[in-house]
């Protein structure tokens, strides 16, 4: 039992940052309200986001523990789908571990101007 607990703790503590290239992000739908994209990450994972409401730029990155990669996906498989609500942001950027950024999606210039001309105090979503 002690060995199992030790393995479980190790697999949960060892977290790997997933680079943009390894995430395999593909946009699968872009309509008037939202953009939907899929990742090709094996197993489950978690993500961290930060939205600058003034600029409309959302930053995101994915990370994964060994438990999420090899074990938890058996019990709780993810669909690996993410949505961008266009009313909440005008650009979504992936940030790699070294700080390199890659644009996942960016609104057309006229939508950016409209977003930036409004005050964004309402709740997200």
Give short role names for the model-derived ranges.
Residues 10-27:
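Ser/Thr/Pro/Gly-rich low-complexity linker/stalk segments immediately outside membranes or between
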Residues 9-11, 34-35:
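Short secondary-structure boundary micro-motifs
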Residues 1-10:
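Hydrophobic membrane-insertion alpha-helices, especially the h-region
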Residues 20, 28-125:
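Polar, acidic low-complexity tracts enriched in Ser/Thr/Gln/Glu with frequent Gly/Pro and Thr-Pro motifs
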